[in-house]
């Protein structure tokens, strides 16, 4: 469930951090992801985390990383927010494919 701490509409620019992982094994573990929107002063505006797949061959780190990005962007679209978005991620694959 998304936790909203501050109104994103008061900001023209947002920073989005996304992350995902699969434990205790990759592939086949429990894939989880999370995202956080910050303002320009590192103040948390909204965040979420969840299990996105519980086992099976599709439960991978890469799947979880992309879920984090997709869920965050979907939520942002639902808020009808417009502005500049800066995305930060530690997944080399995600960064290179999205950039």
Language model segments and positions:
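Loop-to-helix element that buttresses phosphate recognition and phosphoryl-transfer chemistry
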Residues: 64-68
């Amino acid at each position: 469930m998304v936790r909203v701490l501050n109104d994103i509409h008061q900001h023209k620019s947002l920073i989005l951090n996304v992350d995902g992982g699969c434990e205790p094994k990759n592939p086949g573990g429990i894939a989880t992801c999370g995202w956080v929107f910050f303002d320009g002063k590192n103040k948390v505006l909204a965040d979420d985390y969840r299990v996105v797949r519980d086992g099976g061959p599709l439960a991978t780190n890469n799947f979880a990383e992309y879920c984090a990005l997709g869920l965050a962007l979907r939520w942002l679209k639902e808020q009808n927010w417009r502005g500049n978005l800066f995305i930060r991620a530690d997944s080399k694959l995600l960064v290179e494919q999205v950039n």
